[in-house]
């Protein structure tokens, strides 16, 4: 059980530390970061129940509908909703990079709980693949969501545009990720590897830009 718990949480902790330490202009209190992580972990349960309910009723049988609505939209919308109401309006959210920290923290909380349940069902031997793909992809969605929420918080003139992008882009990227898995199930790595490399490049650029704008 200890090894399974470690395998479920360790990738998220490593990624969270990576992005936390990338903050060049101050750091957030760990207490609030942990709080957003736990909110993300708890959020996974109602989202999972909702997804299973729709699947049980025969909705979203089409792979593209499943990828874009059931997985991409549902998961990213609820993460965005919780991030907006629990972190965006908080006094500690006072830099653009804070959005990245909180977005990554909440997303990795969600991914850790999802990862733990998957490992319980499928065995700890699947942990490496889970760390490299689903967990890291959730971190990247959190970076992008948080980056644009940070822009919205600090740049009132274009707030609506940044808020829309903070939801739309993570939904789009998450949906494309799941579409690759569903449509290219046997040979998905040929598409997924370049896709993930592009996602990581985008995430690192957002990290650099957020730090530059916070100067």
Swiss-Prot record:
It is a multi-pass membrane protein. It is found in: Cell membrane. This is Protease PrsW. Involved in the degradation of specific anti-sigma factors. Responsible for Site-1 cleavage of the RsiW anti-sigma factor. This results, after two other proteolytic steps catalyzed by the RasP and ClpXP proteases, in the release of SigW and the transcription activation of the genes under the control of the sigma-W factor. GO terms for biological process: proteolysis. One of its GO terms (molecular function) is peptidase activity. It comes from the Bacteria. InterPro entries: Peptidase_PrsW_arch/bac (IPR023596), PrsW (IPR026898). Its EC number is 3.4.-.-. It holds the Pfam family PrsW-protease. Keywords: Cell membrane, Hydrolase, Membrane, Protease, Transmembrane, Transmembrane helix. NCBIfam families: intramemb_PrsW.
